[in-house]
């Protein structure tokens, strides 16, 4: 993959937020850091060890540091990237900006839901990024995330990431 992971993490912080205490997201799911779903994904023993935290109860009581949140997000991005490449190997051939956009979208909605954007994927395979960007906006996801979808669709169209 060509995209800069540190830029992606900054975009995810902007889009998802950075919360160092456990909170409930809009669906009532316990979440922490940069959108880490504690009910589906949790925090592995290895991640707790890497963060120097004894157990998950400590996370619920005291929260995590920004460095911990970034570590969790980097691990999540790695998983999302692997899932996305298995589902759509063509992502590896895209430029860095468009890779970043698709990883951002997959991070937000999950790869299974992103796979349902069939017209967008057909346009990406044809390198028709004008149509791909329009298909991004013609979705329930776009109505849910509003400005995020507009920014990402513009970047898909132009090949340039702004702001």
Each model region followed by its residue ranges:
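Surface-exposed patches in mature extracellular/periplasmic domains of secreted proteins
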Residues: 19-23, 86-97, 135
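Long, amphipathic alpha-helical surface segments
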Residues: 1-21, 27, 36-40, 70, ...
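Substrate-binding/active-site groove segments that recognize
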Residues: 26-54
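A residue-level signal for beta-strand positions that form part of recognition/binding surfaces
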Residues: 9, 29-31, 99
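Alpha-helical segment that forms one wall of the substrate-binding/catalytic cleft
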Residues: 51-88, 96-103, 108-114
């Amino acid at each position: 993959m060509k995209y800069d992971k540190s830029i992606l993490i900054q975009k995810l912080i902007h889009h998802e937020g950075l919360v160092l205490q456990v909170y409930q997201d809009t669906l009532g799911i316990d979440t922490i850091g940069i959108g880490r779903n504690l009910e589906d994904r949790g925090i592995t023993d290895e991640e707790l060890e890497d963060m120097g935290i004894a157990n998950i109860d400590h996370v619920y009581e005291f929260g995590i540091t920004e460095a911990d949140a970034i570590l969790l997000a980097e691990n999540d991005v790695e998983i999302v990237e692997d899932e996305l490449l298995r589902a759509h190997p063509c992502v590896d051939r895209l430029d860095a900006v468009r890779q970043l956009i698709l990883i951002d979208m997959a991070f937000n909605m999950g790869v299974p839901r992103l796979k349902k954007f069939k017209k967008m994927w057909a346009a990406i395979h044809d390198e028709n990024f004008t149509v791909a960007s329009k298909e991004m906006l013609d979705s329930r996801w776009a109505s849910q995330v509003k400005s995020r979808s507009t920014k990402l669709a513009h970047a898909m169209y132009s090949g340039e990431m702004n702001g």
